[in-house]
Amino acid sequence: SFLSNVRFSKNGKYISYTKTKANLEKNDYEHYVYVYDTQSKENKEYTSLGKEKNIVWLDDTRLLFQTSRDSNIKEKKKEGEEWTEYYSIDVRGGEAKAFLQLPYSVTDIQACSSGFVFTANYSNADISLHGLTGEERAKAIEKKKEEADYEVLDEIPFWSNGLGFTNKQRNRLYRYETASQKIEALTPEFMNVEYFKVSENRVLFIAEEYHDKLEQTNALYEYDLLENRCSCLIEDGNYNFSFADYMGRDIVCAASDMKSFGINENHKLYFVKNGTLELFYENDTWLLSTVGSDCKFGGGKTFHTTDNALYFLSTLEDFSVINCLHRDGRLELLTARDGSVDFFDIYKDTLVYGAMKDYGLQELYLKENTEEIEITKHNRTVFEEYSVSKPEKIFMESYGESIEIYVIKPVGFEEGKEYPAILDIHGGPKTVYGNVFYHEMQVWANLGYFVFFTNPHGSDGRGNRFMDIRGKYGSIDYEDLMKATDIVLESYPIDRKRVGVTGGSYGGFMTNWIIGHTDRFACAVSQRSISNWISKFGTTDIGYYFNADQNQSTPWNKVEKLWSHSPLKYANQVKTPTLFIHSEEDYRCWLAEGLQMFTALKYHGVEARLCMFRGENHELSRSGKPKHRVRRLEEITNWFERYLKKQERE
């Protein structure tokens, strides 16, 4: 079970959350609303259709959730209309009731004093069917069908991973008045809202308005719902904001000017004072959890404010925690320095959070003062039914840094016996591996493999300077990975001729890079990879700014540098049999990246295979259709079995 979106009720008596489960037969995911009673300690499922999520508390006992139940709306959606349905339920008893129907594809919703504020997808190019009837509606539907054959692009990015083509689409801010049932747009047609937070009659939001090219800076706004007035607090052009909220009478925010370490620079915390930013805390951590796992689905709150404190997630070394930053500047760590805290909520002095602790799967934990209890047991039976090999931790030195290396032994490990091994490389590169459960790694450990992984330079958790490998891809990070491999092979009974390598996204880039620079690995699996920084620049949703920033070059000012950091340049040196895993709708690292490397290997006579997944994107391994996730893991595992256990079969 995957847990997400934990929320206290208004009076703190109840805690709601979403439980998501994969349904292999339906090849989809089911979402259920659960509520925990903090007084009776009872944990109860409140919905049963498997379509309920995105919970908002209306008051002390009633909650609102998104679902899909109305047959008329389903028919309208088939014709091309956008609708989002909300139902309410009283946790003291009774059936769920239809509460709100919005003629938009809602992306987030929050309650305000007079109704709701929400964001929704808005298209400046699409044909709207809302309000049309009779012949006029029929003609519009026919026109939409005709236009479905075409995509007109006149801005960048023109598509987005997980969303498809997004040309002229924006995430727009709206207000819904309960009394009048009136919906009003609060932002212009071409403004894209990235974040908003409601506090009674005021709304803070982060947005940027653009027409041809989306830049990486944005602006901070405040909307007064009583006076219907929008004020720009900090203008666009200087900062990238990621969060803002009210802290008593003050406004606190997280932002970076990106001048020292580029687009991945850690955001500092500021107060907004008279149109300027006043430093609150000199932060040098990423303000969320970047601890990876293939057993997370959905998210939740990562910031919370009171009159005198700011609570936030951050990634430290190889774990993530909840911090409390007091108004006087004192920083207090609220959770253990291990595992991954993924989301949380706070009511007065009580903290509830979702985490992967003690190498387990996600559960919810309740902490009041110093006392902490686990309030869910959704995933405990997994460890009673299956064998799990927990990682050991060893260390290496690299340019003055002590870097952890995790090693998972094969299940049923026997002294005196040599085993095959797999080096697994994380994506990002600004993420981390930690002492956190990975399903794929345990599958391999159960099949008799050592699995090892590390956090090379470029990873998160150690500050900006460690993270910053701009212009250095394939150098210092490659050195770290090869050194980690050397140390693991020296420390464990591994057959050096039966070691494989795999990774996804940046990890796929490194896999491609590795096979072009060494033949030490018996086989490789390159997933959702990068092979050519030049082609990625012009074909992906982030390429035009991410490539320029991370490589310190563009195809027009330093094309030789882009090419020198491209694994494709070295494909003529590859001898390693390589499997490529790529999704057809991966617009983060487009299919062309895998195809180019695959073609190059085939051209040069190297054994290669590519498995493409239709209808999937960059998130295949984490949230792809269940059957596709199974097939992906089968493809990878079969490749390792073929090349790393060949000697055993012989």
Descriptions of predicted regions:
Residues S1-H31, E194-F196:
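Beta-strand-rich domains and repeat architectures in extracellular enzymes and scaffolds
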Residues S4-N5, E146-E147, E151-D154, W159-S160, ...:
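Non-catalytic accessory segments flanking enzyme active sites
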Residues R7-Y14, N54-L63, D108-S114, Y195-R202, ...:
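Blade-terminus and WD-like Trp-Asp/Gly-His loop motifs, strongest in beta-propeller folds
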Residues K19-Y32, T47-K53, T67-Y87, L102-S105, ...:
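A flexible loop/linker signature enriched in serine peptidases of the S9 family
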Residues H378-S491, D495-K497, G504, G538-T539:
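Cap/lid segment of the alpha/beta-hydrolase catalytic domain
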Residues P456-E650:
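Active-site-proximal cap/loop segments of hydrolase catalytic domains
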Residues E278-G299, H378-E392:
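Surface-exposed loop and turn segments in beta-propeller and other repeat-based domains
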Residues D37-K41, D90-G94, E177-Q181, D224-N228, ...:
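Short loop/turn segments that connect beta-strands within beta-propeller blades
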